[in-house]
């Protein structure tokens, strides 16, 4: 067993070096984002302006990703990550300078977030597409589990660390911490050399920029199984967005704001636990079955979370829901990495990222109003459903959101059942050949197990 674990570490060594650097950078950026959120809300007291901070973080990613994908496929992916990390950090540095000289305004943060998000639109597909170059096929699920783990760790650490640092070193100290974190990520990338991608004829053929920008979508449409997988994956992002917008007001029906952070941290721990589980376990040989199974369980857990007016039931249900999400995301990534040629992964993953990024805020803007304007009035003490469904699940504040969660759970189960009946998706791992760079990655890993490959 010990020898097996040592072998796994040796075969994933280069990926782990990059992963550690990116984890530290993500903690730095997430801590800064938390601090800026607090600054905006304290400065304005406006929920709308607070929400706009997230919008300016997300919208550029959706708009720029189709353009970034073709460029990522043409550029060296390691250098793309380095340049994107450094340039994105410049926006944070500008915020720090403006804060120190006392000239920082809310619109500066919107602008800086937009600036940063543009470069992250290049960084994300470059990082995702690099995984298959650094990791042998049998460890792709582990690598993707570590990537889920990375986001879970940042979700737990950033709010706590941000709160402490705001008190001790204030905003300028947090920005200095962010710059230091990016420098560490820069060093980790400088220590490794990524294998070169063998550009296929289709990838190198001359074409218009518009066709290049839409190539990722065209590629998916030509492979209905992969398109179905991306849309199925995006539905989980939509659900997460909906749960996020419901969680805070629903939990505040039971506890104070001071205890809310503890509940949210538990959900972050669930993501970390799920990521660790995948990293250690390695996932099922048939990834699509892991996706189906976890999505089905997700629906059950969401349904249970809304079933009673109980903080314990809600917390356990949503905790278990978030526990399944790293398995869904890592298994989805593994299928995509196995079935999409490395030379076009930048374009395909950019489109995938844009679709998923759009699904998340869509959950916010649809589930939130539905909960507030439709379901809460229906389940009020004198609401239209108080005498029927209300007799089963209760009435009053929060019960409308609970009922909406139950409906989301049922729809998730129904969606999963329909997805299972779609043969192109169910047999996607059989019908499409494996085209990843396993040989390149394996050769590279085996030749560099004893030492980190320095840039020549």
What are these regions (language model features)?
Residues 53, 63, 80, 94, ...:
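C-terminal transmembrane bundle of multi-pass solute transporters/carriers
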Residues 102, 129, 133, 175-206, ...:
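Helix-loop junctions on the cytosolic side of multi-pass membrane transporters
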Residues 34-48, 245-258:
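Short amphipathic helix-loop junctions that connect adjacent transmembrane helices
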Residues 44, 76, 98-103, 307-309:
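Helix-breaking motifs and short loop linkers at transmembrane-helix boundaries and internal kinks
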Residues 32, 41, 94-99, 116, ...:
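MFS-fold secondary transporters
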Residues 11-19, 47, 103-106, 110, ...:
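Primarily residues marking transmembrane-helix entry/exit sites
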Residues 16-36, 54-72, 76-91, 108-167, ...:
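Substrate-agnostic recognition of the 12-TM MFS/MFS-like secondary transporter fold
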Residues 2-15, 195-231, 440-454:
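Juxtamembrane intracellular "pre-TM" segments in multi-pass secondary transporters
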């Amino acid at each position: 067993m010990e020898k097996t674990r040592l072998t796994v570490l040796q075969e994933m060594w280069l990926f782990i070096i990059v992963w550690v650097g990116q984890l530290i950078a993500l903690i730095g950026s997430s801590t800064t984002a938390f601090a800026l959120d607090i600054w905006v809300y304290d400065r304005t007291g406006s929920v709308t302006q607070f929400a706009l901070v997230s919008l300016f973080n997300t919208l550029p990613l959706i708009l720029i990703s189709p353009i970034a994908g073709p460029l990522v496929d043409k550029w060296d992916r390691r250098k793309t990550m380095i340049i994107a990390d450094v340039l994105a950090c410049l926006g944070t540095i500008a915020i720090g300078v403006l804060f120190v000289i006392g000239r920082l305004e809310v619109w500066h943060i919107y602008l800086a977030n937009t600036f940063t998000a543009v470069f992250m639109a290049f960084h994300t597909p470059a990082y995702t597409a690099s995984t298959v170059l650094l990791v042998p096929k049998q460890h792709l699920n582990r690598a993707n589990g570590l990537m889920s783990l990375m986001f879970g760790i940042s979700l737990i650490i950033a709010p706590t660390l941000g709160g402490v640092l705001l008190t001790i070193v204030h905003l300028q100290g947090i920005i200095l911490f962010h710059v230091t974190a990016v420098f560490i990520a820069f060093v980790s990338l400088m220590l490794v050399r990524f294998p070169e991608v063998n550009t296929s004829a289709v990838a190198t053929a001359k074409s218009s920029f518009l066709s290049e920008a839409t190539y990722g979508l065209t590629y998916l449409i030509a492979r209905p199984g992969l398109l179905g997988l991306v849309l199925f994956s995006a539905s989980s992002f939509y659900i997460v967005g909906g749960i996020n917008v419901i969680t805070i007001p629903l939990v505040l029906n039971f506890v104070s704001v001071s205890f809310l952070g503890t509940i949210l941290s538990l959900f972050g721990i669930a993501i970390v636990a799920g990521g660790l589980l995948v990293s250690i376990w390695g996932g099922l040989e048939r990834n699509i079955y892991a996706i189906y199974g976890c999505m089905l369980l997700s629906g059950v857990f969401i349904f249970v979370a809304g079933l009673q007016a109980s903080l314990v039931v809600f917390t356990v249900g949503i905790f278990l829901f978030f526990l399944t999400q790293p398995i869904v995301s890592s298994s989805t990534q593994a299928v995509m990495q196995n079935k999409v040629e490395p030379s076009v992964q930048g374009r395909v993953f950019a489109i995938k990222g844009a679709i998923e990024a759009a699904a998340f805020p869509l959950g916010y803007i649809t589930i939130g109003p539905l909960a507030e304007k439709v379901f809460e009035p229906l389940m009020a003490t004198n609401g239209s459903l108080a005498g029927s469904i209300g007799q089963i699940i209760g009435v009053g504040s929060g019960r409308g959101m609970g009922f909406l969660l139950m409906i989301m759970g049922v729809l998730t189960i129904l969606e999963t059942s329909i997805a299972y009946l779609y043969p192109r998706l169910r047999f996607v791992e059989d019908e499409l050949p494996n085209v990843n760079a396993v040989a390149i990655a394996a050769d590279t890993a085996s030749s560099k197990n004893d030492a980190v490959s320095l840039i020549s």
